[in-house]
Regions:
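Macromolecular interaction modules
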Residues: 1-120
């Protein structure tokens, strides 16, 4: 089954305040990611923990987007407004959005992101 590739990604780097990591991870996994991926146009979300290196934030989240406009949609803005609140000090966060430049389109059917070859 083919799965479309989004035209943009939002990456979020996070460093929880010392002593709040368990609460942070519970909130992020149980509330934040499911809330965000419920927004039309956010195709999926994944989280990562730093496994090598010490000059970067400990956590990374990547959200695949149909396109950048998703982050300006009424649905997204309402989702942010209605988000489950954090009951712990806010982590240090850096949020960046990247637009896909190559390939211009494609699917995941062959795991390359390139459009499938047409039979000759």
């Amino acid at each position: 089954m083919e799965q479309a590739i989004g035209k943009a990604v939002m990456v979020v780097f996070m460093e929880p305040v010392e002593g709040t990591e368990l609460e942070f991870n519970d909130w992020y996994n149980r509330h934040h990611v499911p809330e965000r991926v419920s927004v039309p146009g956010i195709l999926n979300g994944r989280r990562y923990e730093l496994s090598d290196g010490d000059e970067a934030p400990k956590y990374l989240a990547i959200y695949e987007l149909e396109n950048e406009s998703v982050l300006h949609s009424d649905a997204y803005l309402q989702n942010v407004k209605d988000s489950t609140p954090m009951n712990f000090p806010r982590p240090k966060v850096q949020r960046l959005v990247y637009r896909q430049v190559f390939p211009e389109s494609g699917t995941f059917d062959d795991k390359t992101g390139f459009p499938p070859s047409k039979p000759t």
